[in-house]
């Protein structure tokens, strides 16, 4: 019974948010989702952002904004004290959403998905903040960017690629790689690679070294929000880490690429740039 009541509260919260978005665009937005924060600024709604999450650092305009926690530790009291008329939250933050519903604060429900999910989020976000045309224009621009990348790599051999987005420095422990779902997987496919874990219906996979040997990637593409630690020697040091799996084709041919930058791992307005960088690593000749 309690679970049913909680579900009804959440539904009411989301319906209230939808109704609010249709009648009056939000003027004071609190965003707990860095990807959506980027979208807000990209469609010209930056001045309407009243606070952001603890992890927001782009665009630079967010530097002076109040911080209200993040996915696991949202500060409800501080959020309410800011008197927002829209809060961007993750779909999994059901407790927060229920509390906001009780305070009659509209919620924009964000759910992590693939590239199409980015377009869907923008399509819903634009009207909610009075920026419908700007959001649709950004969607069009992003689709055009991705289309240009597809054109560049069309007809190229598609290497079997291991896309790594998490690993302990100097080690092959704590390995996280792209599975067959999610925006990273979608970007890799557009960039002209074949995800070696495309058959795994998850966004991330934690493979053993034995599994990596069996999958035999032809290219290893590592993406990190921050650069490699260790200065100019870092790439060589990290290549030596991968050399432990010397029988993997990517290691044999030294087709190991390290890309760094937060834009590479955020499902937001910079995915076109990130996808092009993937393609440049996989098919450098297509950009000469």
Region spans (language model):
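Short helices/loops that flank or line small-molecule/ion binding pockets
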Residues: 76-83, 103, 207-216
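A short, structured surface patch at a secondary-structure boundary
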Residues: 27-82, 86-96, 196, 224
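Bacterial N-terminal signal peptides that target proteins for export
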Residues: 1-11
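A ligand-binding cleft/hinge motif common to bilobed small-molecule-binding domains
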Residues: 94-102, 219-239
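His/Asp/Glu-enriched short active-site or ligand-binding loop at hydrolase and phosphoryl-transfer sites
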Residues: 53, 178-204, 222-224, 258
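Extracytoplasmic substrate-binding proteins
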Residues: 28, 95-172, 194-199, 251-288
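Short secondary-structure boundary segments
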Residues: 33, 91-92, 165-167, 200, ...
């Amino acid at each position: 019974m309690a679970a049913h009541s909680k579900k009804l509260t959440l539904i009411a919260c989301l319906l209230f948010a939808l109704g609010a978005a249709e009648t009056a665009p939000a003027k004071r937005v609190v965003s707990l989702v860095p990807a959506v924060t980027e979208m807000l600024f990209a469609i010209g709604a930056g001045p309407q952002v009243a606070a952001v999450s603890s992890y927001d650092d782009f665009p630079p305009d967010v530097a002076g904004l109040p911080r209200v926690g993040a996915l696991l530790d949202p500060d409800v009291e501080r959020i309410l004290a800011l008197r927002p008329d829209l809060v961007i939250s993750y779909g999994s933050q059901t407790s927060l959403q229920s509390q906001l519903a009780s305070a009659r604060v509209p919620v924009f429900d964000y759910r992590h998905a693939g590239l199409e999910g980015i377009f869907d989020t923008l399509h819903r976000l634009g009207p909610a903040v009075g920026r419908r045309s700007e959001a649709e224009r950004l969607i069009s621009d992003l689709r055009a960017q991705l289309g240009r990348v597809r054109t560049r790599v069309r007809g190229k051999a598609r290497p079997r690629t291991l896309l790594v987005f998490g690993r302990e420095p100097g080690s092959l422990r704590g390995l996280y790689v792209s599975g067959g779902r999610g925006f990273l997987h979608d970007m890799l496919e557009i960039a002209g690679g074949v995800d070696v874990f495309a058959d795994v219906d998850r966004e991330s996979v934690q493979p053993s070294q034995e599994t990596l040997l069996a999958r035999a990637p032809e290219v290893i593409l590592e993406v990190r929000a921050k650069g490699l630690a260790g200065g100019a020697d870092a790439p060589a040091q990290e290549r030596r880490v991968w050399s432990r799996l010397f029988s993997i084709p990517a290691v044999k041919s030294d087709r190991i690429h390290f890309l760094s930058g937060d834009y590479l791992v955020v499902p937001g307005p910079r995915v076109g740039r990130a996808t092009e960088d993937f393609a440049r690593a996989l098919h450098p000749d297509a950009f000469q």
